[in-house]
């Protein structure tokens, strides 16, 4: 029976969140065993924030939740790819559709930011 | 100027390798600053193996190298997505096209292995 390996990263695994239709990688965050189980049980994506040291559900503040369509793990069971339907206009807290809007071009990182919502409106301080 | 944050994971960042045409996530591995620079300079994917504690180029043994087409980082610059042309039949050392051939189905992980080469042939002991 396959069991996920959380040990390699001290209890966490990377979770690659992919748009189930376009294949675009929307974000990469981290899960522990509890948040992976919450994701599998609720059908919404839950993560462990390394910086805020807390559990969080994607969209708990913004409403931009993610509906789980498919969950895959890899050959050494230490990473997951989760295909989701992204609710709302964007996945990234900056308002960008995907968090991966910075591209390596001619020897430097170039931002291609195109926010689809105003973070100041969505994330009230 | 954007600089990648290797500190969060003690010198490493996750690298999500995606087929540049199909969008399929082929594998997730880890890079340090040196292997990211090698990847950007050589146009082939280089990683740091946490288990073997060494640098490796994808395909150095199998010949299944990966040609870098596009490199993206995210809003907090601590992860990269690299779109590649996969040379040879498969990315995974098991012979599967993608390492993500295990799917969560009805409460358990189910293997959907379909090797496109024989690892015993390709990886001589």
From Swiss-Prot, chains A, B:
Record's function text: Catalyzes the hydrolysis of the adenine ring of phosphoribosyl-AMP.
Pathway field: Amino-acid biosynthesis; L-histidine biosynthesis; L-histidine from 5-phospho-alpha-D-ribose 1-diphosphate: step 3/9
Keyword check for Secreted: no
Alphabetic keyword roster: Amino-acid biosynthesis, Cytoplasm, Histidine biosynthesis, Hydrolase, Magnesium, Metal-binding, Zinc
Keyword Iron-sulfur on entry: no
Organism classification: Bacteria, Pseudomonadati, Thermodesulfobacteriota, Desulfuromonadia, Geobacterales
Gene Ontology process terms (BP): L-histidine biosynthetic process
Protein name: Phosphoribosyl-AMP cyclohydrolase
The enzyme's E.C. designation: 3.5.4.19
Any Pfam family hit: PRA-CH
NCBIfam families found in the cross-reference section: PRK00051.1
Compartment(s): Cytoplasm
Needed cofactors: Mg(2+); Zn(2+)
Sites where the protein binds Zn(2+): 75, 92, 99
Similarity remark: Belongs to the PRA-CH family.
GO molecular function: magnesium ion binding; phosphoribosyl-AMP cyclohydrolase activity; zinc ion binding
Assembly description: Homodimer.
Binding positions (Mg(2+)): 74, 76, 78
CC cofactor note: Binds 1 Mg(2+) ion per subunit.
Catalytic activity, as annotated: 1-(5-phospho-beta-D-ribosyl)-5'-AMP + H2O = 1-(5-phospho-beta-D-ribosyl)-5-[(5-phospho-beta-D-ribosylamino)methylideneamino]imidazole-4-carboxamide
Gene Ontology, cellular component aspect: cytoplasm
């Amino acid at each position: 029976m396959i069991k996920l390996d959380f040990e390699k990263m001290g209890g966490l695994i990377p979770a690659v969140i992919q748009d189930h239709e376009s294949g675009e990688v929307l974000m990469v965050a981290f899960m522990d065993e509890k948040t992976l189980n919450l994701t599998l049980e609720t059908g919404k994506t839950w993560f462990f924030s390394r910086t805020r040291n807390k559990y969080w559900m994607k969209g708990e503040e913004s409403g931009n939740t993610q509906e789980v369509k498919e969950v895959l793990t890899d050959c050494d069971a230490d990473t997951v790819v989760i295909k989701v339907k992204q609710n709302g206009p964007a996945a990234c807290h900056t308002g960008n559709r995907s968090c991966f809007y910075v591209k390596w071009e001619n020897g430097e990182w170039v931002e291609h930011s195109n926010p689809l919502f105003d973070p100041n409106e969505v994330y009230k301080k």
